[in-house]
Amino acid sequence: MIASGPPPRVYWTSLIFLLLACCLLPTGAQGQTYQVRVEPKDPVVPFGEPLVVNCTLDCPGPGLISLETALSKEPHSRGLGWAAFRLTNVTGDMEILCSGICNKSQVVGFSNITVFGFPKRVELAPLPLWQPVGEELNLSCLVSGGAPRAHLSVVLLRGEEELGRQPLGKEEPAKVTFMVQPRREDHGTNFSCRSELDLRSQGLELFQNTSAPRKLQTYAMPKTAPRLVFPRFWEMETSWPVNCSLNGLFPASEAHIQLALGNQMLNATVVSHADTLTATATAKTEQEGTQEIVCNVTLGVENRETRESLVAYRFQGPNLNLSESNATEGTPVTVTCAAGPQVQVMLDGVPAAVPGQPAQLQLKATEMDDRRTFFCNATLKVHGVTLHRNRSIQLRVLYGPTIDRAKCPQRLMWKEKTMHILQCQARGNPNPQLQCLREGSKFKVPVGIPFLVLLNYSGTYSCQAASSRGTDKMLVMMDVQGRNPVTINIVLGVLAILGLVTLAAASVYVFWVQRQHDIYHLTPRSTRWRLTSTQPVTVAEELS
């Protein structure tokens, strides 16, 4: 590998040598008709490689041939009219001179050596850790060494795509800068620099060298702040949900989100979907008063933060108690509704005298109080907001069984082979067992369910409700009426006779009506006037 050009010492040595050579030439030599050929002519040589130079004198009777150069040289071979020299270490561009004697005159020939070398280093300057989408970004390619610079250029690559190309300057090391506008799709894309040494015009080839790639990370952060969702009023020592989200992030999966309550970091569950990042946590506090909850979202080199306040309060109670939850009928019962300081309680619509004091209700347990529900309402004012909490409790009263006379008739009259329900009911606490048994036979009739009534169900039944609190009895008379076949036959006979009589009467009536249409009333014959028929044909027809 070589530097961008030959050392300054080589240039100065060559220049001095050429000036001296020109000055020493005889006048006749400057107008020479003979020449010295230098081969190869204007060669392109790899840096540090040896080069064999052949000097040939085109004249009859050639004399001594020599090679003048500042480079290290050694004789290689020689013949009539020619001499070859080996340059052992070509490290820079320079002009070499071959000279010889022809007809006692000195003639010279020149050749320019061009040294080429690949860059020692091709590197893409470090990229920013994160680059905002759409903002201009300057990417720099650094190249050390390489020659000839006139044939050396630098290409910026995005993956395998060529983004730009620039010639390489002469400074050492050389720096070439390209401007790009990163896109979202450039996130995670590799960028690199490629040097190109194009020696195809010198009969060689195109030499390329690519730097190590660097990955670009792009991001997009919205201008809006995260959205916090949580209850504004928190009861102490109770867990509450906290939710924070931010839309418009890219890439959302690379963003970081934190939730904090005061100085306490919350253990949040983070989920990213499309361009949205969401954090969910549960939190509780043991400190009463106003506190701050913070949500912070970081992406790239930017962050967005939201701070909001909450109020933590202590709401003790209400506690609703019964002096006897299962009271015997007739015993006194005290109902108490109590809560913490500054809490106003109300028992069944009756408030306590002052906040912080309990409310009480006293009663004597009766059957009507069984399953009675008492309600306690507690209110607490926090920063101008009234908070409510309710409790309820049920009283059970123990009392003996009672059969409901209104629903259990003492006398029943039913038809045989019909479906009926004995609607007797009993109340009490504990719930009594009710059964109805026929006196004498202890035959049990179903209670409360449909059954088929038979003729032998007739009789007097003793219905008894029993529980651990006592018993209650009542008598029910059941009269089942059977179906009589004789009576049915008599009824059918009577109906048949009535039908015959009706039919006979109808026949007589019809006959009488028809006879009425066939009767003619005639006036007795007069001795004076002779009767003549006004309708002789009709009468004749009727008589006939």
Swiss-Prot record:
Signal peptide residue numbers: 1-31
Residues bearing attached sugar chains per UniProt: 54, 89, 103, 112, 138, 190, 209, 243, 267, 296, 321, 326, 377, 390, 456
Covalent S-S links between cysteines: C55-C98, C59-C102, C141-C193, C244-C295, C337-C376, C424-C463
Entry GO MF terms: integrin binding
Membrane topology type: Single-pass type I membrane protein
Cytoplasmic side: 512-544
Membrane spanning residue stretches: 487-511
Main localization, broad class: membrane
Alphabetically ordered keywords of this record: Cell adhesion, Disulfide bond, Glycoprotein, Immunoglobulin domain, Membrane, Phagocytosis, Repeat, Signal, Transmembrane, Transmembrane helix
CC per GO annotation: plasma membrane
Domain Ig-like C2-type positions: 48-105, 134-200, 237-302, 330-383, 417-470
Role: ICAM proteins are ligands for the leukocyte adhesion protein LFA-1 (integrin alpha-L/beta-2). ICAM3 is also a ligand for integrin alpha-D/beta-2. In association with integrin alpha-L/beta-2, contributes to apoptotic neutrophil phagocytosis by macrophages.
Subunit (UniProt): Interacts with moesin/MSN.
PANTHER family in alphabetical order: INTERCELLULAR ADHESION MOLECULE, INTERCELLULAR ADHESION MOLECULE 3
Stated family: Belongs to the immunoglobulin superfamily. ICAM family.
Protein name: Intercellular adhesion molecule 3
Gene name of the record: ICAM3
